[in-house]
Amino acid sequence: MGNFGLFVRFTLREGAGEAFDALVRETAAGIRAHEPGTLVYACHEVEGAPNERVFFELYADHAAFEEHERQPHTRHFLTERDKYVEKTEVDRLQPYTGKYPTGAEK
């Protein structure tokens, strides 16, 4: 089975950006340190939309995503994010072509 990805859009509560971004930085540090199956975990501010954040996540496979979801830093993020987020939209992605990091299937 090939790679598995997510595109996630968060609409933040007014004034919550700084605290949300700090939570994300803490979570990303755990991902970098403990998740070899998480190939990309890219978090972005949206130009012209200060209360929007988008994440692109790419996993080696669905099992790597499930392992990501079990990690303490991810569980902490999922518990704490509701303090800062009004709305979350998630698209599950099945990559089929493009330029990917070393180790990712096409």
Regions found by a protein language model. Name each.
Residues 4-34, 38-43:
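N-terminal first-folded block
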